[in-house]
């Protein structure tokens, strides 16, 4: 499944029709009025500007290309071909259904075939996809797909463990529920021992 290319096309189309900052601020004022408050009172006067600025940060992943983040690789690794694993990468996202925060961590591993990538770049890929309106399932697959497309590894493993405030602070109000999603490709999918090793290493994280 290629979750990278279709998203890139949709995002490019959306950017071409992006509303102005003034239109975005006006939309925030409308929401404040709808919620029952006065957007012209002192405490809320600058709120639309602050919200739009916050959205620029929260959704900065739309302006970044995960494949470019993985563009530089290193082949001189003394023949290293075992698992490369990063644990506890912070995930700060928003659910696409309610725009409520998703907070958690991602654990990512891959088996290099031709080259390795700087470890910070893997964390950057997680950040790019998390800084978008997401479902956790889609984000998990996108991380694996980006690594696969950019590096052609022998396998990728991704596990995301997060809490969704659309469930913890509204609706059913279950604050202690975590959601875990996984994607395994290549040797991680086909080799049960390798998958088990990945899961055992997570216990030490």
From Swiss-Prot:
One of its GO terms (molecular function) is zinc ion binding. Its EC number is 3.5.4.16. GO terms for biological process: one-carbon metabolic process; tetrahydrobiopterin biosynthetic process; tetrahydrofolate biosynthetic process. Zn(2+) binds at residues 95, 98, 166. It catalyses: GTP + H2O = 7,8-dihydroneopterin 3'-triphosphate + formate + H(+). It comes from the Bacteria. The keyword Cytoplasm does not apply. Keywords: GTP-binding, Hydrolase, Metal-binding, Nucleotide-binding, One-carbon metabolism, Zinc. Pathway: Cofactor biosynthesis; 7,8-dihydroneopterin triphosphate biosynthesis; 7,8-dihydroneopterin triphosphate from GTP: step 1/1. GO terms for cellular component: cytoplasm. Toroid-shaped homodecamer, composed of two pentamers of five dimers. PANTHER family: GTP CYCLOHYDROLASE 1 (PTHR11109:SF7), GTP CYCLOHYDROLASE I (PTHR11109). HAMAP family: FolE. Belongs to the GTP cyclohydrolase I family. This is GTP cyclohydrolase 1. It comes from Maricaulis maris (strain MCS10) (Caulobacter maris).
